[in-house]
Design a protein with these regions (language model features):
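Inter-helical junctions in multi-pass inner-membrane proteins, predominant
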Residues: 1-13, 132, 153-158, 185-224, ...
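Membrane-interfacial amphipathic/re-entrant helices at transmembrane-helix boundaries
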Residues: 1-16, 45, 56-59, 85-94, ...
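Membrane-embedded helix boundary and interhelical linker motif in transport proteins
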Residues: 5, 27-73, 77
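Alpha-helical transmembrane segments within multi-pass membrane transporters and channels
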Residues: 21, 54-97, 104, 237-242
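Pore- or pathway-lining transmembrane helices of multi-pass membrane proteins that form conduits
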Residues: 37-41, 82-106, 213-225, 241, ...
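Transmembrane helix-bundle core of multi-pass membrane transporters
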Residues: 81-156, 183, 248, 253, ...
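Cytosolic-side transmembrane-helix boundaries in multi-pass membrane proteins
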Residues: 108, 168-175, 179-182, 252-280
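Helix-loop-helix "hairpin" substructures at the membrane interface of multi-pass membrane proteins
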Residues: 127, 131-208, 234-237
Length: 280
């Protein structure tokens, strides 16, 4: 049962990342390979503030606007100039940015492992016999609330409806008078908030190191592919399922194979969809 609880916690972290990733993927039309590094950058900014004696959750709030500015700046400096570029160009550009951010993190924070100063971590013993820490309870509650608010935002607000319109057909949205760059801006902010949250929660639940960006991206991308690009429901289900699979696999496999589970999920999902496409 402990593996099940751990899987739900990890799944919630993946859900935060995959939800932000799939929103931007659907809106901009390409998988941003730098998203894992943005998650990690937000976590390291939070770590820097936390190291000054600021409580970790307050540090997270302070790191959010900095991470948002970084995400928007990257888009304005690079991707805005490539809006009409082909898919391979956009992917290569995002790969270059991911390498730059990874190098930046290594230069500023070094190559070692870092831990957040969370303080005492009280534990709760559940009726099923598993143990969950208070920070893990917060991670689950935060993730549920964030995803619920995002669902309401996309379904009930004008900005959310405009976001769906731009994601469906950017040309028609322009003809209808929707300011697509404004929509991109606000969704970058949302994506950055989800990214920094997921990165920080992973650091709280385990640790941080400069190579974690790719390890973050793999499960996030796998959950997005599994749940269908652009589908928040799919990102939610895919993230939870992948988190549970990764943790339950630790019963039989070494924890070193966890990133391989995400990669395997991507390959299997693409294979199944290709077979179904050919049959259809």
């Amino acid at each position: 049962m402990q593996y099940l609880v751990n899987g739900i916690v990890v799944g919630c972290i993946i859900v935060l990342g995959s939800t932000g990733f799939t929103i931007l993927y659907a809106l901009l039309g390409f998988p941003n390979l730098a998203y894992g590094e943005i998650m990690l950058l937000g976590a390291y900014i939070t770590l820097a503030i936390n190291s000054l004696g600021v409580p970790v959750y307050a540090a997270l709030l302070l790191a959010v606007p900095v991470t948002c500015m970084a995400a928007v700046s990257i888009d304005r400096l690079v991707f805005k100039r490539l809006r009409q570029a082909n898919l391979s160009t956009l992917i290569m550009a995002s790969f270059g940015i991911s390498l730059f951010l990874r190098s930046l993190i290594r230069v500023v924070w070094g190559t070692g492992v870092h831990l957040f100063a969370v303080g005492p971590t009280p534990q709760l013993t559940l009726s099923i016999g598993a143990v969950i820490t208070i920070p893990q309870v917060f991670i689950v509650a935060y993730s549920v609330l964030a995803v619920a608010l995002l669902f309401l935002f996309r379904q009930k607000t004008r900005l959310g409806k405009a976001t769906r319109a731009v994601a469906d057909n950017r040309t028609l949205a322009l003809v209808a008078g929707i300011d697509t760059e404004r929509i991109v801006f606000w969704n970058l902010v949302i994506g950055a908030v989800l990214a920094v949250s997921g990165g920080v929660f992973l650091g709280i639940d385990s640790s941080l190191n400069p190579l974690q960006g790719w390890r973050l991206l793999l499960p996030v991308y796998a959950a997005t592919i599994f749940g269908r690009v652009g589908s928040m429901y799919g990102a939610l289900c895919g993230g939870l399922l992948l988190g549970l699979t990764q943790e339950l696999s630790a019963i039989y496999l070494s924890t070193e194979y966890k990133p391989g589970i995400a990669l395997f999920a991507i390959i299997v999902t693409i294979f199944i969809r290709f077979r179904l496409f050919r049959k259809g």
